[in-house]
């Protein structure tokens, strides 16, 4: 590379060493910056919507936690401004651990909801099919009590036929839920 003799003083400036890795400039569009800022603001809104127990499971520093707790108490326009501040605070930090913890919380909730739907369907099959469904439950949960299941099913059928409240059906669901939790 040719250097003009008058430009030698540029070599003496600290931090101006030639480095081929630093020559590449990463250009980010203004729209992309805005999209990232909006995504972080949405992440902040999700954090504000969480309860105290869920917030305790997410790694937040004191400033961010205080801003989130304040936003939970504020209404209307002040809340919007506070969400803007939370987005700004998130831009100054690495949001990846926060997003990961939030995803785990959501995934855990979704898994629990899916398990409950599965148990409800199993309960309905137990009431409608009887012994065939009992053998399926015993295959899934070997430590289940066959006699207790049969008694609950018999009572649930009586309640259904008598148009009574489904007390035994709820008990079947509770029993299946305890079996599923014990199985984990």
Curated annotation (Swiss-Prot):
Signal peptide: none annotated. It is found in: Cytoplasm. Pfam families: DarP. Disulfide bonds: none annotated. Transmembrane segments: none annotated. GO terms for cellular component: cytosol. One of its GO terms (molecular function) is ribosome binding. Keywords: Cytoplasm, Ribosome biogenesis, RNA-binding, rRNA-binding. GO terms for biological process: assembly of large subunit precursor of preribosome. Residues 1-21 are annotated as: Disordered. PANTHER family: UPF0307 PROTEIN YJGA (PTHR38101:SF1). Member of a network of 50S ribosomal subunit biogenesis factors which assembles along the 30S-50S interface, preventing incorrect 23S rRNA structures from forming. Promotes peptidyl transferase center (PTC) maturation. Belongs to the DarP family. This is Dual-action ribosomal maturation protein DarP. The gene is darP.
């Amino acid at each position: 590379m040719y250097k003009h003799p008058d430009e030698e003083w540029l070599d003496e400036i600290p931090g101006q060493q030639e480095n081929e890795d630093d020559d590449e400039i990463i250009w980010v569009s203004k729209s992309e910056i805005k999209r990232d800022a909006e995504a972080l603001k949405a992440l902040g809104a999700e954090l504000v919507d969480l309860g105290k127990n869920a917030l305790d499971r997410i790694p937040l520093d004191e400033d961010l936690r205080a801003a989130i707790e304040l936003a939970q108490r504020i209404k209307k326009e002040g809340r919007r401004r506070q969400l803007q501040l939370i987005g700004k605070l998130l831009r100054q930090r690495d949001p990846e651990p926060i997003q990961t913890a939030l995803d785990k919380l959501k995934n855990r909730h979704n898994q629990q909801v899916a398990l409950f739907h599965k148990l409800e369907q199993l309960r309905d099959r137990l009431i409608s099919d009887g012994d065939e469904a009992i053998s399926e439950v015993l295959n899934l949960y070997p430590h289940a009590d066959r006699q207790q299941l049969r008694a609950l099913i018999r009572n649930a059928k009586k309640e259904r036929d008598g148009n009574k409240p489904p007390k035994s059906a709820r008990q079947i669901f509770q029993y299946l839920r305890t079996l599923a939790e014990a199985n984990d």
